[in-house]
Amino acid sequence: MSDTLVLRAATPADAATIAATIAAAFAQYRGKLVPESGAFGETAEAIAAELSRGAGAIVAERNGEMVGCVMIQEREGDLYFGRLAVLPAARGTGLARRLIDAVEADARRRGLSGIRLGVRVVLTDNQRLFRSLGYREISREAHPGFDYPTSINMRKSLV
């Protein structure tokens, strides 16, 4: 059997599988992020509602099974992405980069000027990946109840 990877736009019917993929991918961060990641509260219903309201997602399927996904939404003239999730068994294959490439291609098709994301201050490996792909820090912010930065906002210009 050949190993086939397909990246495609998600539909609301994908919501349960997206929620499960996010939960499995983010499990490594449980108890390590302060405050806890909102990804742990994602539900199929919430994701379906987001998709129905105009947010989007790109899913990666290998041989028909979802192995990764990323949520997207237009914000302030840019395309924002979050919940970049790759299943543990699919890590180290370049899939995160492929998903980000797909986000960037979508933003270009939409005629948007850039891509934005947020990453936790403590996730230095993730920051390193984003920087290697041309993303630059634009600001830091604290989650509610914190008096120090917990998140870094990054942006990549497409113009």
Regions found by a protein language model. Name each.
Residues 6-20:
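A short beta-loop-alpha structural element at the N-terminal edge
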Residues 20-48:
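Conserved GNAT-fold acetyl-CoA-binding loop/helix
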Residues 48-59, 80:
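A short helix-loop-beta-strand connector motif used in the catalytic cores of GNAT acetyltransferases and
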Residues 59, 65-73, 80-85:
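Conserved beta-strand in the GNAT
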Residues 86, 92-105, 132:
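Conserved acetyl-CoA-binding loop-helix of GNAT-fold acetyltransferases
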Residues 100, 107-119:
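Conserved GNAT acetyl-CoA-binding A-motif
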Residues 116-120, 131, 136-153:
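Conserved catalytic-core motifs of GNAT/GCN5-like acyltransferases
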